[in-house]
Amino acid sequence: MRNQTFIIVGAGQAGAMAAATLRQQQFDGDIILIGKEYHAPYERPILSKEYLINPEEAPKYLFSEDFYLKNQIDLRIGQSVSQIMPSKHCVVLENGGKLRYDKLLLTMGARARRFPLLDQLGENIYTLRTLDDAQRLRQAVKKDKRILIVGGGVIGLELAATSCELGANVTVIEQADNIMGRCAPPLLQDYLLNRHQEKGVQFFLDTRIVSAQKQGSELVLILNTGEKVIGDIIIYGIGAEFRDQLAADAGLVTNGGIVIDSRCQTSEPDIFAAGDVCLQREPLTGDLQRRETWENANRQATIAAHAMMGLAPPQPGAPWFWTDQWGINIQMVGNMQAEEWHVQGDLQSDKAILFGTENEVLVGAVAINQGREMRNLRKLLANPMVVPA
């Protein structure tokens, strides 16, 4: 019986972790890991923080070069797949080469959503999604630079804190009337907004950019309020575009991402997907959900690897992620849209836990500088419990 070949398209967090999991689970066939970037798989969370702050900070690779050799993982960086042919169990590379697979895993992730109004300004306009992006930003963010950050999500706020720590003057422009609106409860939004403002970050909330101009070396944004903001650099983070076109062209079910089931299987039985590129149905509501987090990429990679081998997948825990801003570690687990939130501890001292409940059932929690407590909270949220009145 010939060896099976498993191909993984996308050499990021999910792709590399899936390859590692396959070997951990004793898969003895061929593994081919194909990545478009000219870098071995690396950790992305540090790109908006330590990597920018410390010029000596090296990229943090997921595994050493020896790891891929020792585990016989055929890592092919700087290569792309241009077509999937499900009926032939074959992928076509951009250079015209073809590779046959028994199982295929798609982990292409996402790219930064473009903002043409800003892109047309030319130089000194940045996004942050990749190591190459971070290397460019590292050269640009300097002391006394006026930095305009468009987008008040997690990455925008981390960049605001990092830029301030480097001595820059920072302004954040956000279209919504709050920050981190998609992933933080109101108590946490207000707390973080106050911390940033105390450090000198200026905010324009509930505000749109209606015009963007370049005047000499200055970048000028006109807001819908009529106000004008001027900067030397613009960094924008307004969401992501998910790399699902390859899957859609192959006839897989997509909906602004590749639709997968609880086993990370797509509409094609021998094709699986994991990470940011995916949409998965929530067990309780049936709604399609995407979780763009480091933890979710690892979790789905593990589930997909087990499913590809025909093994029972591990039980998923409650969704968890974290952010570090101003030296404050904030970890979130479970449902951040809970109906009610309760505070234990003192937010003013930057040490507290927020509990989110629905009908007196604990459904979410936020730990602020309480990493040890978060370990217990993650276990609790794996099995929601009634909170005593």
Language model feature labels by segment:
Residues 108-166:
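Glycine-rich dinucleotide-binding loop and its adjacent helix/turn
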Residues 2-74, 162-183:
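Beta1-alpha1 glycine-rich phosphate/pyrophosphate-binding loop at the start
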Residues 121-144, 220-222, 227-303:
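FAD-site-proximal beta/loop scaffold in flavoenzymes
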Residues 85-99, 213-228:
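Conserved beta-strand-loop-beta-strand element in the redox core of flavoprotein oxidoreductases
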Residues 155-211, 293, 316-325:
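Rossmann-like dinucleotide-binding cores of NAD(P)H-dependent redox enzymes
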Residues 2-5, 11, 24, 277-373:
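Mid-to-C-terminal Rossmann-like scaffold of FAD/NAD(P)H-dependent oxidoreductases
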Residues 9, 99-109, 150, 229-239, ...:
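Short hydrophobic core segments
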Residues 68-85, 197-209:
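A conserved beta-strand/loop element that lines the FAD pocket in flavoprotein oxidoreductases
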